Amino acid sequence: FPGLNLALAAACDALGVRLIAVSSVTASTWGANQPGFTWPEMEAMLVEGGVIRPASVAVAAGGAADAAADLAGEDRALASRIRDAAAVRLGVPALRPGSFEEAVGLRLRAYRRAAAGAPVALYVNVGGAEASMGHSPAILGVGTGFVTGRALRGTRGVTAWFAEQGVPILMLLNVRELALRWGVGL
């Protein structure tokens, strides 16, 4: 989903909106899944090159428990090294949770700290990060696009927490569905 991340950053910049993000190293088969080209590494290159403004306020390994716990030992260690290096390049904390619940809490603290008391106008979830979406089977029925808090009940991730606070939610996950809905050619 690096294209969605970049499009979101560009849209926020064009609108004069401050983007606050927590970026994950691990990704699915939809891009940003090669060492050297994970999203946090791409973001660092784009920021260093003056292409986009910094958005990430923290970097996580991603995957299970936001700690790449679903990866084999060597791959988990690589994800951790990439997380740490990208966090240094971006000048933000590296999140090191010990559980799913801690991962959600660390992300929420990062968002609240960066917002500095200002209200969050919209929460945009790009991709399928477990800490953001939760790990309940209910998440599979949430859909894509603007979703209601009712659809998120029982998911327990960061997205559900923001929905419970009355923050509008935009899910950018099923790109094909979004393109068909809005008449965008594939």
Could you tell me what each predicted segment is?
Residues 2-6, 25-29, 64-65, 127-132, ...:
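Gly/Ser/Thr-rich loops at beta-strand to alpha-helix junctions
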Residues 5, 9, 104, 108, ...:
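Short amphipathic alpha-helical segments and helix-helix/interface helices
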